[in-house]
Each structure stands twice: as C-alpha cells, then as structure tokens.
C-alpha cells in the first residue's frame, strides 16, 4: 500500500476526467490500458474475456457494455488522475449526465473506422451542456477500414467541433505501427508486446513530407486560436513546443478546440501519449470557474472556490449498494475539507449526517483515507439519507448546488414476487435500486395493487430485473412492458368546482372557478399554476391547497387514467366562507373543477416517440424499412457509412417491444440499433380508441 499522504497531490496536478464513447468504440479497453500503464493493474484486462476492472458488475461482464460508472484513481508522472467511467448505452444516459456534472474534462473515444456514431452525438451534446473540455482519441487504428482523417472530419460535420490533430498515424489497419507527434516532430513506436515500452525515433524518410504538411495544418489551426501567435505565424517565425501546448490548453479548457490523438488500445499502442495529453490539455480544478450554488437562507447565488479554507461543499453523483459495506455514496468535493467521522449537512434534505469512513475507489477495490480536499472524488460510508444530486456542505454555511435533471421514464412493467417468501425482499431490493438510480421509478397501482417499475427503455428494465435475481436473490414474475402514455388538452376550457358539506357543527366550503389551457410543447413545461383572482375572493393561504388539488387530479386523466401533462391552470374566481372554508374543501373543489374542465378541453392521448438509429449491411435495408413502415415509423434519413447503411427513424415506443429479436431475424443478426426517447406526440384517433377501450 503506498503512503496515503503521497496521494494528496497539489490541486494543479489533479485531473478529474471521464471517458465517453459510443457503445463499441473501445472505451472500457482504453480505461483498462490507462490503469495498466499507470501501474495500478497487474494483467491486461480484456472486455471480450470479461475480466476488466471498470466493468465489474456481472451483467456488464456478460453483455460487454458498461452500466455503472465506477470511479477509479491512478497516477501518471506525478499527477493524479481520477477517472469516472461513463456508460455508452442510451438507456443509461442519466448516468452519463450525472458523471459529466462532476468531471472537469473528458477523453472522447471514437472508432477510427466509423468516426462519430449516433450515440457519440448524444453524449457529446450532454458534455456541451455542462461545458466539459475534451480531447479525442481515435481508437482501433489497427482495424480494417480505419481512416484517421475521415474520422476526424466527422467531428466537424456531425458535432460542429474544432478538432486539431496533434498526431498522425504511422500506417493503418494491420500496418498500424505507431504515431508521429506533430508538436515534437518525433515518431513513437511501441516496442514491447504489452505496450509498456515505447521509444521516440526520427520520423521515417517516406513519411517526412506528409508529417510536415500535417504539422503545418496543425500550426495554422493553433495560430487561429491566439492573435499573438497568429502574427508570429504569418511572419514565418518559429512557434515553440511550449507555446503550442499553452495555446492548445487554453483553447481546450475554453471549449474552442479539441486536440485529437490516435492509437489502438487493444493492441497496446497510443495510450501513454494520451495520458500526457490529459495532463497537457485537460483542466485541473483550478482552471475552471468556481462552482455556483444557492444559499439556503435567502436563495442568493454564492460561489465556492476550490480551496481548503472555504466552507465544505460537495455533490453526490452516485449511490451504490455494496454487498459488504452497505450504502456507498460517491461525491465530488468542490471546496473545503471533510474528515472521516465528522458530521456533514445534506442541504437538499435538510438533515445532518455522520460520515463514518471515506474511501477512494479503484474500480472494485477500495482504500480508506482520513480526509478529502477540493477536487477529490471519493465515496462515503454511513450517509443514510443522501441520494444522487444532493448537496453535502458545512452546516454553518449551507448551500445547494444545482439539481441534476433526469428525464422522465417512458416504459413500465408490472412486477411481482414469484413466492410469498420473496415479497419482503422485493420491496427492500426495489428501494435500494431506485435510490441508486433516479431514472427508475417504483409505484404501487392503487386499483390493482400491482408493483409497477418504470424506466428509460426495455434494456434498462431488463437489467433491473436481472439485478433483482442476481444481487438480491429475489425471484420475480414480470408482465408485458407497458407504454407510459400521457393525456393533454387541445383547447382552453373553464369549469367551476363547489364543495359544500353541512353536517352538524362546522361545515366544509370551497368554491373555485378555473380555466385550463394547453402549454405548447416547445415551452418544455408540464404544468403551470397562475392565480388571477382579484379582491381577495379566495384568501391567498388557500392557493397552495388549490394547486395541490389540481396536481392530484392531474395524476389521472379523463380518457384512460394516464397522467395529464402540458396544462396551464388559471384560477379566475371563486368564493369562501369565513368559518367553513378549509384547505381540504378547496383542494376538493379545485380537483372537481379541473376534472370538469378537462372533459370540455378536447382531451387527447399522447405517446412516447423514440429516435431509432439502425446500422445494417445494405442487403437487409429494404426489409428493415418495410418493417418500420408497418410500425408507424417515420424515416428521417438514410446514410451510407462504408459498406453499412444507417437508417434514422422516429417510431412510437409501443411499436418497438421485442424489436431486438425482430431486427435480428430481419438481418441474420448483422444489424444493430440504438434507441432513445425523443418526445411525446398525439396518438392517432383509431389507435387511441383501442388503448382507451383496453383501460
């Protein structure tokens, strides 16, 4: 075990990074190799063999996809690098969002034969949302069809990025031997089988001319980033290695450029220069603006600098239930210092908690430490109420960092224990899982008494059911997947609700006149409440009760009992009784008025529409498209990428159940697809009638 004190590097020598990628770009292998060359890993893990470090849940080992973002720490040239592994599958985009929120920078890994693939666009846009600086790694340069410059070009066409290649490959496909560093103008070759020994040599004569041309292209792009350097460049002066790196670093941190490197992680080539680039171009916590929060007492905006003397502030970005030590709460420290055994205040929940132990994680091993400082990513033991997105802080100076927004689930499944004995275990297990994953919702259907789980897609729920069996030993039976329909209105309507009860003694009196109107989808709001009463016809203290009554009525719409969305409720008028009026009476009156107005407002059913991207060999395309047409899909684009076709379509979720099996048989297993939620849309009348009948 190394000396723990040695683990605390100066803040400028700390890098918190994520590795983001499309599902098969080779992200896990890249992470593995990083851990191997930084000396934390004693054998080379290989995803295809199922023994990698970051993919450590059994389901991931079988499926070869990364689901849980495990935080890992390693050292390189005196710098400490914390890596958050982010999942590349669309059903887990919430997990990606959460990881990006706490990162300072990222490596985007691409497959050099494909460049930007559909899922990489989604992850890239999420990284844009949180202004995460990134460098790009074109992986799989040894694969048939690898084309470095084509892949770089897709960063421009698909992502509108400003890529600046700082390397050029030596050969490609089976002849890929190494890289040329365009800043130093040296060739780098990997000498040993495991890639741990590499050496710099002079650039081979036959590549010299191309290397000079590529360096010129790089210098031109670097010069455009800085006026002083541009002048030097135009006057033909020499630009030093330090200057190039300084300008590139600044531009990367400001999200104005993306340095691009290449390699073949599986063939153990290109990883050490990638680690150098993490240090050269990605920010330390000191390079980024202070984190913004809201003071609990008055809602004023406050900023916290990455300084040990500031009050403690941290954000919880992951909760895992560890079979041995119970609940592990992963957090990122933004300011201040926290010792193990001390108390911390959860400002989101308004409760103080004691953190009994603090651990630094190495994918699935852990190392205990006495305290954490700004920039640290650690996991705490003993925090009972803390959940993802919560702020942990100093009780004397409480702040709330912004909440992380998670998308609404679109698919539901009824689930029941296989035996009586599983009943209690199921409740506990679902509680633990929904605590870990905010996009998993669990509720009990009032009418049928069934337990319903809802999530982001079929794969998401399959994995939940799988984990119930595997981790919690609960056997369950599941129903057919159900679409999370919604209801809304097409025109404004008014209605009145009066609730009057006169039974000996005190009565009940509530009277509300409401108008409801549709909220256009582009406003992105599901509900708005406006009080337009004048002259105190309804005292202000009853307004929250009226709003609560409306919200309760919205949980079950008039057509088929689905939740109501995109409705603005305006209280126009009403009356009250000095003695008999109560919150309860107004809540009921508001609910009555809302239900009445809904009936008049031309209610319609909405269904989730998914964005579907299918990659297929050309010969199956005809069958795939005619099948899509039979599923009410709208084809949006057809693209050719190499010998493959990419079909992009919007399709109702209800038409996609079991699609994996259908696509497999249509393409003899050669086509693949990814799917993610796009928007809600009105259900065609004929289909709506059938849905309403069933209910």
UniProtKB/Swiss-Prot annotation:
GO biological process: ribosome disassembly
Superkingdom of origin organism: Bacteria
Predominant place of localization: cytoplasm
UniProt key word Transport: no
Pfam families per the UniProt record, alphabetical: EF-G_D2 (PF22042), EFG_C (PF00679), EFG_III (PF14492), EFG_IV (PF03764), GTP_EFTU (PF00009)
PROSITE patterns per record: G_TR_1 (PS00301), G_TR_2 (PS51722)
InterPro entries assigned to the protein according to its UniProt record, in alphabetical order: EF-G-like_DII, EFG_II, EFG_III, EFG_III/V, EFG_IV, EFG_V, EFG_V-like, G_TR_CS
The keyword Repeat belongs to this UniProt entry's keyword annotation: no
Name of the protein in question: Elongation factor G
Organism of provenance: Thermotoga petrophila (strain ATCC BAA-488 / DSM 13995 / JCM 10881 / RKU-1)
């Amino acid at each position: 075990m190394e000396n723990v004190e040695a683990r605390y590097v100066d803040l400028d020598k700390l890098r918190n990074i994520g590795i983001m990628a499309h599902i098969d770009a080779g992200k896990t292998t890249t992470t593995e190799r990083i851990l191997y060359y930084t000396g934390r890993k004693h054998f080379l893990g290989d995803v295809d063999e199922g023994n990698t470090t970051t993919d450590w849940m059994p389901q991931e080992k079988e499926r070869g996809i990364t689901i849980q973002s495990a935080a890992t720490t390693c050292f390189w040239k005196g710098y400490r690098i914390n890596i958050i592994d982010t999942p590349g599958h669309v059903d887990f985009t919430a997990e990606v969002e959460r990881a990006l929120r706490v990162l300072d920078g990222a490596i985007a890994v691409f497959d050099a034969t494909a460049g930007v693939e559909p899922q990489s666009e989604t992850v890239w846009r999420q990284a844009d949302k949180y202004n995460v600086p990134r460098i790009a790694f074109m992986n799989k340069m040894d694969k048939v069809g690898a084309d470095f410059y084509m892949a770089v070009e897709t960063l421009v066409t698909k992502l509108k990025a400003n890529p600046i290649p700082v390397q050029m490959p030596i050969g490609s496909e089976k002849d890929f031997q190494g890289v040329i560093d365009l800043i130093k103008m040296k060739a780098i070759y990997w000498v040993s089988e495991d890639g741990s020994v590499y050496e710099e040599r002079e650039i081979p004569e036959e590549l010299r001319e191309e290397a000079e041309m590529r360096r010129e292209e790089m210098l031109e792009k670097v010069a455009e980033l800085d006026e002083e350097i541009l002048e030097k460049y135009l006057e033909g002066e020499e630009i030093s290695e330090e200057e190039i790196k300084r300008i590139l670093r600044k531009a990367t941190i400001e999200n104005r450029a993306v340095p691009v490197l290449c390699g073949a992680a599986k063939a153990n080539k290109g990883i050490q220069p990638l680690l150098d680039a993490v240090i050269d171009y990605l920010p330390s916590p000191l390079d980024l603006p202070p984190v913004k929060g809201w003071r609990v007492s008055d809602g004023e905006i406050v900023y916290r600098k990455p300084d040990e003397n500031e009050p403690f502030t941290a954000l919880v970005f992951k909760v895992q239930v560890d079979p041995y030590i119970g609940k592990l709460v992963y957090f990122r420290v933004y300011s201040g210092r926290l010792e193990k055994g001390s108390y911390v205040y959860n400002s989101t929940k308004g409760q103080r908690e004691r953190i009994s132990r603090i651990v630094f994680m190495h994918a699935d091993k852990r190392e205990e430490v006495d305290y954490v400082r700004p920039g640290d990513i650690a996991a705490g033991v003993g925090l009972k109420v803390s959940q993802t997105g919560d702020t942990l802080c100093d009780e004397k100076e409480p702040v709330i960092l912004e909440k992380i927004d998670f998308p609404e689930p679109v698919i539901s499944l009824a689930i029941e224990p296989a035996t009586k004995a599983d009943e209690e275990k199921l409740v506990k297990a679902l509680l633990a899982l929904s605590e870990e994953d905010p996009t998993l919702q669990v509720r009990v259907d009032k009418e049928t008494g069934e337990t319903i789980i809802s999530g982001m897609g079929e794969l998401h729920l399959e994995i939940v059911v799988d984990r119930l069996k595997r981790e919690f030993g609960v056997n369950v039976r599941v129903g057919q997947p159900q679409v999370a329909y919604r209801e809304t209105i097409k025109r404004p309507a008014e209605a009145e609700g009066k609730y009057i009860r006169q039974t000996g003694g005190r009565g009940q009196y509530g009277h509300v006149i409401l108008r409801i109107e549709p909220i256009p989808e582009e406003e992105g709001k599901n509900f708005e409440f406006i009080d337009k009463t004048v002259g105190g016809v309804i005292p202000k203290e009853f307004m929250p009760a009226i709003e609560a009554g409306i919200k309760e009525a919205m949980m079950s719409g008039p057509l088929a009992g689905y939740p109501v969305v995109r409705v603005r409720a305006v209280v126009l008028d009403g009356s009250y009784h000095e003695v008999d009026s109560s919150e309860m009476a107004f809540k009921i009156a508001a609910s009555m008025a809302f239900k009445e107005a809904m009936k008049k407002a031309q209610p319609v059913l909405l269904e989730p529409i998914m964005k579907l991207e299918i990659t297929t060999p050309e010969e199956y395309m005809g069958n795939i498209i005619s099948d899509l047409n039979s599923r009410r899909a709208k084809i949006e684009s057809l693209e050719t990428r190499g010998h493959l076709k990419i079909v992009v379509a919007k399709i109702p979720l209800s038409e996609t159940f079991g699609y994996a099996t259908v696509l497999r048989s249509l393409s003899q297993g050669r086509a693949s697809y990814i799917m993610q939620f796009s928007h809600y849309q009105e259900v065609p009348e004929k289909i709506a009638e059938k849905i309403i009948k069933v209910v």
